[in-house]
């Protein structure tokens, strides 16, 4: 069975965000913290201000696709990452959003 490595619990989100280690740009905010699990985990947060449930789920699906592309490229590293979508993401195309997320991941890895 495939392990999705997704953060789902609210207390895990709060723990990562409370450490105040983040990078941001116009479309996304990425909070991160080192974990001791030995593998990468991620969580996605989309606020209600970005639209109705259909729109928010579409955004989450797009971010998951962007992350899947990143996982193939990146080596294994043990971090927990929370990706928060911002309003600007709605105005950009999928390709522009993917470039923005790639820039943040590169900045995060440095």
UniProtKB/Swiss-Prot annotation:
Keyword Ubl conjugation: no
SUPFAM superfamilies recorded: Ribosomal protein S5 domain 2-like
EC number in record: 3.1.26.5
Record function comment: RNaseP catalyzes the removal of the 5'-leader sequence from pre-tRNA to produce the mature 5'-terminus. It can also cleave other RNA substrates such as 4.5S RNA. The protein component plays an auxiliary but essential role in vivo by binding to the 5'-leader sequence and broadening the substrate specificity of the ribozyme.
Quaternary structure annotation from Swiss-Prot or TrEMBL: Consists of a catalytic RNA component (M1 or rnpB) and a protein subunit.
The name this protein goes by in its record: Ribonuclease P protein component
Reactions catalysed, as given in the entry: Endonucleolytic cleavage of RNA, removing 5'-extranucleotides from tRNA precursor
Keyword terms: Endonuclease, Hydrolase, Nuclease, RNA-binding, tRNA processing
Membrane-spanning parts: none
């Amino acid at each position: 069975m495939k392990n999705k490595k997704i953060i789902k619990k609210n207390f895990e989100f709060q723990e990562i965000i409370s450490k105040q280690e983040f990078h941001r740009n116009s479309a996304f905010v990425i909070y991160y913290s080192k974990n001791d699990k030995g593998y990468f985990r991620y969580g996605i947060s989309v606020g209600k201000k970005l639209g109705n449930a259909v729109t928010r789920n579409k955004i989450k699906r797009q971010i998951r696709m962007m992350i899947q592309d990143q996982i193939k490229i990146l080596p294994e590293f043990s971090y927990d990452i929370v990706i928060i979508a911002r309003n600007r993401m709605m105005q950009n195309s999928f390709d522009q959003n993917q470039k923005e997320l790639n820039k943040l991941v590169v900045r995060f890895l440095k």
